[in-house]
């Protein structure tokens, strides 16, 4: 099926070997090709600017996919969004939310991930979970605080800075330019159709996590030391006690990891392709 899909898509793509593709066909046509080869179409990083559906194409997926919209079981939220922002759009109430990481480098794998209930590890079971069939489901979404994402707030391309102010920000408060990269937070404020977040009862919890590489003062050697002792970043971020971490890397780092777990870190929002950052409390 993958070879067949690649062969058919090569008719619409200039270089089929590139990692990020531009296909010369509509999304309305694409979903039929995907399903022809037993695939499922799921919009990825659905709100980011430049190339995503909600970020740069439409305010409603149903306008693009029309009667085929019900065949899309899920969307992937992206680093700069979360469940609470996405659930301000009513057409997403019946869609599963996924928090998938990119895989450009080993440290970035699973900086966002999903906890999934399945009977065994297979694509068939995964699809059942995404479609909420036979008791399979997404149990929890683990993702960055969206402020840490590269496109959370609107960015002025002239001044080279995030633009402060209440969302939606649509022009620079310094130079008055509209040469901006719209932030996900600001874009959702424009396209939402709910006055507040209202999630369906079966929506799984969204758990914020601050990857170790974002924590101030935590360098590669200390991260490697933590991983040597505790095996996975998930253990360190979500499961280990303060005392366990303190014994390996000291009170200061242990305190910050606990603060990240409890959502008590101060974060400077990202924008314009630059990650947000954690502000160390003095």
Put a short name on every predicted segment.
Residues 1-73:
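Extended substrate/RNA-proximal surfaces in nucleic-acid metabolism proteins
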Residues 95-111:
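Short acidic/histidine-rich active-site segments
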Residues 51-59, 107-120:
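Histidine/acidic-residue-rich catalytic or RNA/ligand-binding cores of hydrolases
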Residues 41, 75, 102, 175-176, ...:
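Divalent metal-coordination and catalytic microenvironments
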